[in-house]
Every structure is written in C-alpha cells, then in structure tokens.
C-alpha cells in the first residue's frame, strides 16, 4: 500500500459525476486540484451493502472537508457506467455531490490498494497534501466500514503542522514540534 511520505502517482480516469442525462461523466486527474488537499477513498464494489453507508457519510460531510480546503474523491474498480447505474438504482446515492471514480487495475496497483484475492479495491483512505505528498494511508477489511469523522480528525491533525496526541481533536492543544530553550 502507498505509504505516507510518497508522492501520489499521477492519474487520469473517468468518473460518474451526475445522474443528469448528458452530464453523467467527466475525466478526473490528480492534476485537477492544485493547492488542495485530496481525500481519496475506495470501496470494493457497487451494488453492495456497506459501501453506500460510507459514500453517503462522505457526501454528508463534504462541506466539512471543503472548510478544510479538501476535495473528496471516491470510487471502486467498477467503471463509471456501473457507478451511474447504481446511483440511479439506490435512493441514497441519487443526489451525490462528489465524483465516483473508476479505479482501474493500473491505478489500484500504483496505489497498492488491490485486495490480494478478491479482485477489488480495499476500503482504503488516502489523504494527500497540496504538494501531492501522501500524508495518511489506511485500509479496512472488506467487511468493516470506515469512520468518516476519523478521516476528518486525521485531516485536522495533519493541517496543524504540529504533533497531535492519541485521540486529539480540533481545538485541543497540540504538542509543539519546536524544541524550547530553557531560560
């Protein structure tokens, strides 16, 4: 799996961005978001049970990510047409406001997020800073959904530029990374 400190591999893919006829698809590239934080999440498959709970929670919290100057991109190894069909079929997904990307074989290999036996992407979360450096990467087993509030907490911590203790929350004291001289 890609690790913190790595440069995000450049990518270009197709995404489902709407269910409106004629506006369903768009090309999405890692270069489309200069100066922004990226929160990239992958899920195993469309037309499943845990995945929509995560997608909907990310979507409900888009404004919280935007307040942190972060763009959310989700997706799976299913293509953009599958994403569209699923969104049209699933009531909770019809009004999504963020893109669902096609994570093809090369992209999931480059990110190191391919499940070793199932032929799908892991439930991975990757946070990338405005310089294109991966600052956080985590993956859950296929059977356990992630916690979007924890993704926000980690993003907050990364954006402080300081050391953040276990269970730290935005607004709490950080540990200064600067050594202080004794007077």
Language-model features: where?
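Chalcogenol-based redox active-site neighborhoods
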Residues: 1-183
């Amino acid at each position: 799996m890609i690790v913190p400190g790595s440069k995000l591999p450049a990518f270009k893919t197709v995404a489902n961005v709407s269910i409106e006829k004629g506006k369903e698809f768009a090309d999405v590239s890692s270069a489309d978001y200069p100066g922004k934080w990226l929160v990239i999440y992958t899920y195993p498959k469309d037309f499943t049970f845990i995945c929509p709970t995560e997608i909907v929670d990310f979507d409900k919290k888009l404004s919280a990510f935007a307040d942190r100057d972060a763009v959310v991109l989700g997706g799976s190894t299913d293509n953009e047409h599958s994403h569209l069909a699923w969104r049209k079929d699933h009531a909770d997904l019809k009004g999504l406001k963020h893109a669902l990307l096609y994570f093809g074989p090369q992209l999931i290999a480059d990110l190191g997020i391919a499940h070793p036996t199932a032929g799908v992407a892991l439930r991975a979360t990757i946070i990338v800073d405005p310089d294109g450096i991966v600052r956080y990467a985590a993956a859950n087993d296929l059977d356990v959904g992630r916690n979007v509030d924890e993704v926000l907490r980690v993003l907050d911590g990364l954006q402080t530029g300081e050391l953040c203790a276990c269970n730290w929350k935005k607004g709490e004291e950080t540990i200064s990374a600067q050594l202080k001289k004794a007077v």
